[in-house]
Amino acid sequence: IEAMAHHIVPARDVLYLGRGTDYPLALEGALKLKEISYIHAEGYAAGEMKHGPIALIDELVPVICIAPSGPLFEKTVSNMQEVQARGGKVVLISAYDGVQAAGEGCLATITMPKVHPLIAPMVYAVPVQLLAYHVAVLKGTDVDQPRNLAKSVTVE
């Protein structure tokens, strides 16, 4: 994951795609990257990619695809292919069979254990957070005290 972070460091923008129960993890991954590395990142539902985010795709915008094996995997692969057809660079986070099926042509892959789709977001959160951490460290930001963040929210 640390070696993969080198590919993300120069980016000004990063997109995270997730489908189904992995969509909130795409949002969380983008939030973590923004908070500690100060790179603009957005999380999107993979099925909504054609409704806006696809216009942002080029060779300078890495796309992190969170795609566990399961019934929605092939649909996410279709999104990955659309990104690659536009010159986008894909980082695939998937189980071994997913990486074998769709990893060719990706900028990088992270191979995860095969788990039930309902617990995949908990398992896949680890590499998503580690990627944000390593990008921030490589950029030289203080990951323990991100700028302008409060530890709590005050309600008035």
Swiss-Prot record:
InterPro entries to which the protein is assigned, alphabetical: GlmS/FrlB_SIS, SIS_dom, SIS_dom_sf
Database matches in SUPFAM superfamilies: SIS domain
This protein's record includes keyword Membrane: no
Chief subcellular location: cytoplasm
Residues covered by the SIS domain: 4-146
Active site: 151
Protein name: Glutamine--fructose-6-phosphate aminotransferase [isomerizing]
Upper lineage: Bacteria, Pseudomonadati, Pseudomonadota, Alphaproteobacteria, Sphingomonadales
